[in-house]
Amino acid sequence: MSSLADTIHIENVVASSDLGQELALDQLATDLDGAEYNPEDFPGVVYRLQEPKSATLIFRSGKVVCTGAKSVDAVHDALEIVFDDLRELGIDVDSTPPVKVQNIVSSASLEQSLNLNAIAIGLGLEQIEYEPEQFPGLVYRLDDPDVVVLLFGSGKLVITGAAESADAQHALAHVNDRLTELGLLE
């Protein structure tokens, strides 16, 4: 059996930055090759990169949000490409704008089926939500790390709200330890 940590895969990293200036989005969408701007549908320019695969949302306020990257390094690389492209258009972008990772979404597996009804009872109602008629997963809110773990009957997990990659490992270890303590894992 592999280490549980080996089952963790980052699915999405969301990071933000601020250019510290207002942007003319109509002009930006025209000048930025491949950018999409439909203000009736969404208030920002959507700028997609193929490598690293990501989408960057650029707002009039100068705020920038990058999503879709599969690693923290990739989100930083994507934003650096976006910043370089903006500089090429004559937009004054700091040499190293601050980038803040907002959310890392990971998937993982406990490598066995789970009895979500028993888990809901064992963990108690204070930290969980489980309404299988509305959603097939059990929602487990952790305080440390401050993440939300979705547990599914298949043993698969989704960990969201992480600020750094290690949070997913800590969350997976916590869930595994807690379910083992409760006698709910083989």
UniProtKB/Swiss-Prot annotation:
Keywords: DNA-binding, Plasmid, Repeat, Transcription, Transcription regulation. CDD domains: TBP_archaea. Signal peptide: none annotated. SUPFAM superfamilies: TATA-box binding protein-like (SSF55945). One of its GO terms (biological process) is DNA-templated transcription initiation. GO terms for molecular function: DNA binding; DNA-binding transcription factor activity; general transcription initiation factor activity. Sequence repeats lie at residues 10-86, 101-179. Pfam families: TBP. It comes from the Archaea. PANTHER family: TATA-BOX BINDING PROTEIN. Belongs to the TBP family. NCBIfam families: PRK00394.1-2, PRK00394.1-5, PRK00394.2-2. General factor that plays a role in the activation of archaeal genes transcribed by RNA polymerase. Binds specifically to the TATA box promoter element which lies close to the position of transcription initiation. This is TATA-box-binding protein F.
